UniProtKB/Swiss-Prot annotation:
Belongs to the aldehyde dehydrogenase family. AstD subfamily. Pathway: Amino-acid degradation; L-arginine degradation via AST pathway; L-glutamate and succinate from L-arginine: step 4/5. This is N-succinylglutamate 5-semialdehyde dehydrogenase. InterPro entries: Ald_DH/histidinol_DH (IPR016161), Ald_DH_C (IPR016163), Ald_DH_CS_CYS (IPR016160), Ald_DH_CS_GLU (IPR029510), Ald_DH_N (IPR016162), Aldehyde_DH_dom (IPR015590), SuccinylGlu_semiald_DH_AstD (IPR017649). GO terms for molecular function: succinylglutamate-semialdehyde dehydrogenase activity. Keywords: Arginine metabolism, NAD, Oxidoreductase. The active site is at residues 244, 278. It comes from Paraburkholderia xenovorans (strain LB400). Pfam families: Aldedh (PF00171). Its EC number is 1.2.1.71. NAD(+) binds at residues 221-226.
Length: 487
């Protein structure tokens, strides 16, 4: 087997064996050995050796490589979509959009580098002020499973454009997609050692995060893991740590004339990607009146008809399996805890086969649950909270340590003005799903949702550091010298 990619060559891992499985069938998709601590060390040292030449190359040369990568991603879009669907359970219609996003990210990242970093000059009385940006060196990229191609790409592309060398540790649940992506980078002509792949589970990640020769760590994943990394690097200011994590995201339903439009956007917010987007709505605030009752009745009715099926089924389902049998079981267990604490099931989640990752979407009214836990249930589990006044809804919506996304569905523009002024989140949408985001805008949020804005336009900010210079081509004595100096 050749599980790892180090120094421009595929190599066998020397750590424990592991495998990924199609969550919709249970069949093995990828099998191999993880990277041991020694393998990780070789990968980091390979990146360090490659860094000097890569960072010394021109921005145009680096951009030419990433543009070739984008072109190859477009050519191989169907193969990528198939790999994403097979390994994650994501329906092909959605996997194709992920592959397209991988290619689209390149031009946005190039634009971001030029506009937010790059080089700028301004004249001074006695010279020229120059602002340049320099790469950090060797950066580790940790990728998630829900978008195993697109989200790591949101770190890797801007890091490479800035001149960094990368060691990529993908999710152990999607190693096959990572291997295919790295092969495309190789075919695009990326020099040996500039991008290295270390496959593996927890121990591989620990070895990479603990390596003393990395200059930065860029992470997209769970808040729990990101918080551990934040604690780990708390005493190491020399490490650039960029975190994009999850959210307990609120969606507030206000007065609307088009109930079906509100229901559609709520379903998209809560259940797209089987609820496995960090921006999915987890808490849905519904007015405690007749209009709220009508909304809930229609929301429950339409949700009950959502199709769930295999990634390559024809016709395509709206939802595929969640990432694993374990994830499915945890979601069902979370539902049972909420029901035991007083929640009312408007639509109960079912895992029809305990050996597979398929679950049906759930709608639970948790209004009467005391001390509701502030946690992200990463799947199709929507919690309904009835409210009396709009200010009450806002107060409860902000009652979270997270701050990734939030949304308001309402016809009244005055409510929107109040909402966007009051809500605490990094992505705040009006009459659009909570998981709708522009690649040309910051992606992320405050609190336990992260500290930087990975995966989009602002990623350039943490991939390079500013270097300020005052320059003069000719060495000259000043017209006057400071008091106390004699020449």
């Amino acid at each position: 087997m050749s599980e790892l990619f180090i120094g421009g060559e595929w190599a066998a891992g020397t750590g424990p064996a592991f495998a990924s499985r199609n969550p919709g069938t249970g069949a093995a998709v990828w099998e191999g050995n993880s990277a041991s601590a020694d393998d990780v060390d070789r990968a980091v040292r390979s990146a360090r050796r490659a860094f000097a030449a890569w960072s010394a190359s021109s921005v145009d040369e680096r951009c030419a490589v990433v543009r070739r990568f984008a072109a190859l991603v477009t050519e191989r879009k169907e193969a990528l979509a198939e790999a994403i669907g097979r390994e994650t359970g994501k329906p092909l219609w959605e996997a194709r959009t992920e592959a397209a996003s991988m290619a689209a990210k390149v031009e946005i990242s190039i634009q971001a580098y030029n506009e937010r970093t790059g080089e700028k000059r301004s004249a001074m009385a006695d010279g020229t002020a120059v602002l340049r940006h320099r790469p950090h060196g060797v950066v580790a990229v940790f990728g998630p499973y829900n978008f195993p191609g697109h989200l790591p790409n949101g770190h890797i592309v801007p890091a490479l454009i800035a001149g960094n060398a990368v060691v990529f540790k993908p999710s152990e649940l999607a190693p096959g997609v990572a291997a295919l992506t790295v092969q495309i980078w190789r075919d695009a002509g990326l020099p040996a050692g500039v991008l290295n792949l270390v496959q593996g589970e927890k121990d591989t990640g620990i070895a990479l995060a603990n390596h003393r020769q990395i200059d930065g760590l860029f992470f997209t994943g769970s808040s729990d893991t990101g918080t551990l990394l934040h604690k780990q690097f708390g005493g190491r200011p020399e490490i650039v740590l960029a975190l994009e994590m999850g959210g307990n995201n609120p969606l507030v339903i206000g007065p609307v004339a088009d109930v079906d439009a509100a229901v559609h956007h709520t379903i998209q917010s809560a259940f797209l990607s089987a609820g496995q987007r960090c921006t999915c709505a987890r808490r849905i605030f519904v007015p405690n009146d007749a209009a709220g009752d009508r909304f809930l009745e229609r929301f429950t009715e339409v949700t009950s008809r959502i199709t769930v099926g295999e990634y390559n089924a024809d016709p395509q389902p709206f939802m595929g399996a969640v990432i694993s049998v374990r994830a499915a079981s945890r979601l069902v267990a979370a539902q049972e805890r909420l029901l035991a604490d007083g929640a009312k099931a408007l639509l109960k989640m079912e895992q029809r086969d305990p050996k597979l990752g398929f679950v049906t979407p759930a709608i639970l009214d948790v209004t009467n649950v005391a001390n509701r836990p502030d946690e992200e249930h990463f799947g199709p589990l929507a919690q309904i909270i009835r409210y009396g006044s709009f200010n009450e809804a806002l107060e409860q919506a902000n009652d979270t340590e997270f701050g990734l996304s939030a949304g308001l569905l309402a016809d009244d523009e005055a409510l929107w003005a109040h909402f966007q002024r009051t809500i605490r989140a990094g992505i705040v949408n009006w009459n659009r799903p909570t998981n709708g985001a522009s690649s040309g805008a910051p992606f992320g949020g405050p609190g336990r949702s992260g500290n930087h804005r990975p995966s989009a336009y602002y990623a350039a900010d943490y991939c390079a550091f500013p270097m300020a210079s005052v320059e003069s081509a000719q060495l000259q004595m000043p017209a006057s010298v400071s008091p106390g100096l004699q020449f």
